[in-house]
């Protein structure tokens, strides 16, 4: 009875060692998941900042294009008025003003288009960063659960070891009596 109880104690000690090794592994994996989450959060924050800047650039380009469009409309109105009764030089100046306004409008629209394209790319990058952050959070939750399960396994193994030691003590006591 004593040798069987001693074997049970050894088996229980082995089980505790295995459970502790599993817990150590789970904790290492958890630490890795936590650092990945921190990195993903940082990448998301950075992407959000770039997105905000791109949105500001787009808004500014929209405003400039609107102003250039208004200036072009005004220049065409001035040209129409000059056609009605201005002298040659005034008419030529009004025509030049329309040409300049047209060029400025084309340039503003090109910038506007480029800003829009950049904004779309940045929005895509921000969406990817959000997806990666969500994945990292889900992974961390799973690793936390695994670590909790491993800790529970250590407790269960320790309880089994305590019970095996009690049985061994009882067998030794019975043998002594």
Predicted feature locations:
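Extended amphipathic alpha-helical heptad-repeat regions
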Residues: 1-177
């Amino acid at each position: 009875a004593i040798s069987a109880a001693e074997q049970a104690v050894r088996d229980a000690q082995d089980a505790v060692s295995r459970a502790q090794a599993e817990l150590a592994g789970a904790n290492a994996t958890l630490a890795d998941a936590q650092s990945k989450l921190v990195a993903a959060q940082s990448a998301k924050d950075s992407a959000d900042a770039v997105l905000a800047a791109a949105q500001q650039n787009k808004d500014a380009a929209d405003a400039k294009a609107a102003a250039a469009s208004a200036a072009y409309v005004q220049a065409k109105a001035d040209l129409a008025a000059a056609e009605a009764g201005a002298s040659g030089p005034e008419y030529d100046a009004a025509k030049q003003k329309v040409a300049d306004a047209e060029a400025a409008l084309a340039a503003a629209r090109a910038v506007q288009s480029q800003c829009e394209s950049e904004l779309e790319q940045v929005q895509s990058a921000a969406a990817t960063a959000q997806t990666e952050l969500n994945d990292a959070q889900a992974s961390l939750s799973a690793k936390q659960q695994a670590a909790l399960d491993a800790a529970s396994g250590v407790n269960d193994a320790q309880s089994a070891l305590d019970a095996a030691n009690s049985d061994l003590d009882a067998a030794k006591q019975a043998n002594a009596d």
